């Protein structure tokens, strides 16, 4: 289930990279214009200028403040989704023995009809036991942040004050390898924390996606202004906090799943046998009636001919 979350994050970051590649148009003189600039970049500049005044005209702390505000607003929603995902993980662990038996039969199947029937049986196992294929993961929090990413990116790019600002010696208007690596490490740590307490088999399936997401963040941060890398870094720290909260509640979630399974034991679907391919092409049980009348007429003609 966590791998689906990693895939969702990877797709969103890929969409972000495409979205940031060239949405704001500029005149020959280099002046920006267009829908994205008017409704995202300019409001983003105003928000950043207001926040910087609260932090003593420090745009770095303004970006951190913006990240904290956004993450605090999204925190209940993201914790709720992560809790649902953890609940689905525990239910998936409970049905794993039945699931592995079905998958073993699917590997041993020799025809497409057998494989399709066993695949339907696996889907029936999920439906009967209330297991969601999406794992309770939604992309709404990431989609909400997409306009914020864009606003921050273009605000830094087209605002003279923001593009020339520095934070701890790092220019916020230029890409920073240090902040890109810090963002990468923060999300890598979040992925490691999310695997604590999971079965070893489940960890193996999660590792690839949990590495892909930080790598995507690394590449986006390296190609974007350092201000966006700072946003990702602080966001990764909040993601670690979310995961620690979920890990704290994991034993309680596991007890909830165990209590539910006591009331509603795991339902195992009846194995279905595929229909043979030639079932509809079998020969009829009764022989086809022969045309005796025609045979009699032919016999009479033959007798007259011999006479």
From Swiss-Prot:
Domain of life: Bacteria
Lipidation (S-diacylglycerol cysteine): 23
GO cellular component: plasma membrane
One annotated GO molecular function: membrane insertase activity
Signal peptide span: 1-22
GO biological process, one term: protein transport
InterPro entries for the chain: YidC/ALB3/OXA1/COX18, YidC/Oxa/ALB_C, YidC/YidC1/YidC2_Firmicutes, YidC_ALB_C
Covalent lipid sites (N-palmitoyl cysteine): 23
Record localization: Cell membrane
Region feature Disordered, mapped onto this chain: 260-307
Pfam families: 60KD_IMP (PF02096)
Membrane topology category: Multi-pass membrane protein
Transmembrane portions of the chain: 59-79, 136-156, 177-197, 205-225, 226-246
Primary location recorded for the protein, binned into one broad class: membrane
UniProt entry keywords in alphabetical sequence: Cell membrane, Chaperone, Lipoprotein, Membrane, Palmitate, Protein transport, Signal, Transmembrane, Transmembrane helix, Transport
Similarity comment: Belongs to the OXA1/ALB3/YidC family. Type 2 subfamily.
Role: Required for the insertion and/or proper folding and/or complex formation of integral membrane proteins into the membrane. Involved in integration of membrane proteins that insert both dependently and independently of the Sec translocase complex, as well as at least some lipoproteins.
Protein name: Membrane protein insertase YidC 1
